[in-house]
From Swiss-Prot:
NCBIfam families assigned to the protein according to its UniProt record, in alphabetical order: cyt_b559_beta
Swiss-Prot/TrEMBL keywords: Chloroplast, Electron transport, Heme, Iron, Membrane, Metal-binding, Photosynthesis, Photosystem II, Plastid, Thylakoid, Transmembrane, Transmembrane helix, Transport
Protein name stated in the entry: Cytochrome b559 subunit beta
Function: This b-type cytochrome is tightly associated with the reaction center of photosystem II (PSII). PSII is a light-driven water:plastoquinone oxidoreductase that uses light energy to abstract electrons from H(2)O, generating O(2) and a proton gradient subsequently used for ATP formation. It consists of a core antenna complex that captures photons, and an electron transfer chain that converts photonic excitation into a charge separation.
Species whose genome carries this gene: Allium textile
Encoding gene, per UniProt annotation: psbF
Cofactor: heme b
One GO CC term, this protein: chloroplast thylakoid membrane
Length: 39
């Protein structure tokens, strides 16, 4: 029972971290790409 309660919390936390990290990396990548294109 302990593993069943801990696993979903870890999964939600993992999804939340990646859900915030992926758009941030793509956003920074798009900004750097636009700066290189302007130059």
């Amino acid at each position: 029972m302990t593993i069943d309660r801990t696993y979903p919390i870890f999964t939600v936390r993992w999804l939340a971290i990646h859900g915030l990290a992926v758009p941030t990396v793509s956003f920074l990548g798009s900004i750097s790409a636009m700066q290189f294109i302007q130059r």
